[in-house]
């Protein structure tokens, strides 16, 4: 064993698990295209103040969880991105996207970094997929983003999901609510944990995020943000709920849901999975109209988005047995060379197959025919194509189905035509 190990909070993903990741990513790419979202990629690190201003200085992410570097040569601190929305908004403002078109629909599958205590589904390097709809934040836009997210879960076969949703109102609503919360919690200050005492002073909304079970009754009795939202905000929220009902999407209105990022306004939501236990949130999002202005954009930009944690999603899928039928095949063909002196000819055959768009593997270690067949079965090859002296002389090659054991002998070009048939994988089902 090497003296070097993966850094705490990171992990390696090998081929079998990588196939599961690829399955999820392909579903995301396909549905993003159906909904009209285009992929965006941003740098893995940004100037630290982007996250301080965008996410909020009082959040746990900024206060405790960011990987921050010594200043760059220009003297500015840099941070590995802990979330995507601030970076996407920075990119949109820098490119001046809304001057090119009134609406932009962007999505991503990206690596992120947070200095958290590693546990199942929570790593220091982790992945998310998500979407950002910029330029419009109407109830229909919120429903569009939510429907996209929920259809990803549905397509993957996930069950036992709970969509929690709330309205956070606008800046004025939340300012009045913060004062009401501060007045409510101050008499209980002696019962609060140290983290909540700090939040009481800086941003009492964050107390509602507390996972301390000793505070649950106190939090449950707190004033509802909904009661501080203006009538217009309530009407918009009710319109979102109607859109969800029309699409057959079940939801629970949760007046304690505030999310952990300061840029959210109006509608916010979170999806939980019963398969995950205590750490049950797999995704969430909401509107963030004020983020553009906070990042120096000059004015508010209507925006709404979501993000889903890939690691937690994959754990939930595994627990529900959703990878049992995935069982991906290896290469379609394994070229079995019967005599070592024919290795060059075997390579030529493999080259022709690959140039014809057929996934092909061939032994590179001059192993015995028996060892090659074991390897072909181990990597789940669909067919074995045999290269021997008789094949070289006759131009006829034996092709064996490694699932059914059926075998046929044909010229190489005829074999290529058969293997290029779109339905060829159907013949590999036992």
UniProtKB/Swiss-Prot annotation:
It catalyses: tRNA(His) + L-histidine + ATP = L-histidyl-tRNA(His) + AMP + diphosphate + H(+). GO terms for molecular function: ATP binding; histidine-tRNA ligase activity. Its EC number is 6.1.1.21. One of its GO terms (biological process) is histidyl-tRNA aminoacylation. Its main location: cytoplasm. Keywords: Aminoacyl-tRNA synthetase, ATP-binding, Cytoplasm, Ligase, Nucleotide-binding, Protein biosynthesis. Disulfide bonds: none annotated. PROSITE patterns: AA_TRNA_LIGASE_II (PS50862). It is found in: Cytoplasm. GO terms for cellular component: cytoplasm. Homodimer. Belongs to the class-II aminoacyl-tRNA synthetase family. PANTHER family: HISTIDINE--TRNA LIGASE, MITOCHONDRIAL-RELATED, HISTIDYL-TRNA SYNTHETASE. HAMAP family: His_tRNA_synth (MF_00127). This is Histidine--tRNA ligase. It comes from Chlorobium luteolum (strain DSM 273 / BCRC 81028 / 2530). The lineage of its organism: Bacteria, Pseudomonadati, Chlorobiota, Chlorobiia, Chlorobiales. The gene is hisS.
């Amino acid at each position: 064993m090497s003296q070097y190990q993966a850094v705490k909070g990171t992990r390696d993903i090998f081929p079998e698990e990588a196939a599961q990741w690829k399955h999820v990513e392909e579903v995301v790419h396909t549905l993003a295209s159906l909904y009209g979202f285009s992929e965006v990629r941003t740098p893995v690190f940004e100037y630290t103040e982007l996250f301080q201003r965008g996410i909020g200085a009082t959040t746990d992410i900024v206060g405790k969880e960011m990987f921050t570097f010594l200043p760059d040569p220009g003297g500015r601190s840099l941070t590995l991105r802990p979330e995507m929305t601030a970076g996407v908004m920075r990119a949109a403002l820098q490119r001046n996207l809304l001057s090119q078109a009134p609406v932009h629909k962007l999505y991503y599958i990206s690596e992120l970094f947070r200095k958290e205590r590693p546990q199942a589904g929570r790593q220091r390097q982790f992945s998310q997929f998500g979407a950002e709809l910029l330029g419009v934040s109407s109830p229909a836009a919120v429903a569009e983003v939510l429907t996209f997210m929920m259809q990803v879960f549905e397509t993957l076969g996930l069950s036992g999901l709970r969509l929690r949703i709330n309205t956070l109102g606008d800046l004025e609503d939340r300012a009045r609510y913060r004062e009401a919360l501060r007045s409510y919690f101050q008499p209980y200050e002696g019962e609060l944990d140290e983290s909540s005492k700090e939040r009481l002073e800086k941003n009492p909304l964050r107390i509602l995020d507390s996972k301390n079970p000793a505070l649950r009754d106190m939090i449950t009795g707190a004033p509802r943000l909904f009661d501080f939202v203006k009538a217009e905000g309530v009407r918009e929220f009710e319109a979102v709920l109607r859109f969800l009902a029309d699409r057959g999407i079940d939801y629970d209105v949760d007046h304690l849901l505030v999310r952990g990022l300061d840029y959210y306004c109006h509608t916010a939501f979170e999806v939980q999975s019963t398969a995950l236990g205590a750490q049950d949130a797999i995704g969430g999002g909401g509107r963030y109209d004020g983020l553009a202005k906070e990042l120096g954009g000059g004015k508010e930009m209507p925006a709404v988005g979501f993000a889903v944690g890939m690691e937690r999603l994959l754990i939930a899928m595994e627990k529900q047995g959703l990878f049992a039928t995935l069982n991906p095949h290896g290469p379609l063909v394994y070229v079995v060379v019967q005599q070592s002196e024919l290795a060059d000819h075997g390579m030529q055959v493999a080259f022709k197959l690959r140039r014809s768009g057929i996934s092909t593997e061939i032994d590179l270690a001059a192993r015995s025919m028996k060892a090659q067949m074991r390897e072909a079965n181990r990597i789940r090859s669909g067919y074995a194509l045999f290269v021997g002296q008789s094949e070289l002389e006759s131009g006829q090659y034996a092709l064996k189905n490694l699932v059914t054991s059926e075998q046929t002998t044909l010229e190489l070009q005829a074999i290529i035509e058969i293997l290029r048939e779109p339905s060829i994988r159907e013949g590999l089902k036992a």
